């Protein structure tokens, strides 16, 4: 919640008087949360993100924009983005009903415009991102992904963090050459 103060000044006949200071409080009507489905990642995994914006006010809020940094971080003098938005994966719901009015720009950053949140209701934006080669893979690394919602009275931010998998992602393949062998023949496994 944000607080504000106000003072009145009265000037008459070269005399100035200040009033007492009054303090008010601005109640935040919108809140945002962000979650990632899953506990950890490997390169190539597809992650699902859920951003929910709740309107506790009595008036619908329209024209909101969601911007997702897709986990961008500074590396040297540049910026790397470890997640790629999965094209056409975004679904936008108002009060649980699929809506179609939002416009998506893949980015980075991922940008969703035209979001509306009904009075006393919520908007839920669900989308997928694929982990790419810029995701950190060292032990105890993670991708912190931040969503920002603008267009309301205040800017909202919500974060979701997912850790790299501590288990290696191993695969093994065995081949036999030749596949057909005569008795006392020789074969090679690789």
Language-model features: locations:
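Exported/extracytosolic protein signature
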Residues: 1-190
């Amino acid at each position: 919640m944000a607080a504000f103060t106000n003072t009145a000044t009265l000037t008459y006949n070269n005399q100035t008087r200040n009033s007492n200071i009054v303090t008010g409080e601005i109640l935040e009507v919108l809140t945002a949360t962000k979650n990632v489905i899953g506990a950890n990642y490997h390169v190539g995994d597809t992650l699902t993100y859920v951003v929910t914006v709740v309107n506790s006010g009595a008036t619908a809020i329209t024209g909101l924009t969601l911007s997702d940094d897709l986990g961008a971080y500074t590396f040297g003098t540049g910026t790397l983005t470890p997640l790629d938005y999965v094209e056409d994966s975004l679904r936008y719901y108002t009060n649980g009903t699929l809506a179609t009015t939002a416009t998506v720009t893949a980015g980075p950053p991922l940008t969703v415009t035209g979001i509306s949140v009904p009075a006393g209701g919520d908007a839920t934006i669900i989308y997928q991102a694929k982990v790419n080669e810029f995701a950190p893979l060292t032990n105890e690394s993670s991708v912190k992904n931040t969503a920002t919602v603008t267009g309301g009275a205040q800017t909202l931010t919500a974060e979701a963090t997912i850790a790299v998998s501590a288990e290696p992602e191993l695969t093994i393949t065995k081949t036999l050459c030749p596949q057909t062998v005569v008795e006392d023949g020789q074969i090679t496994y690789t």
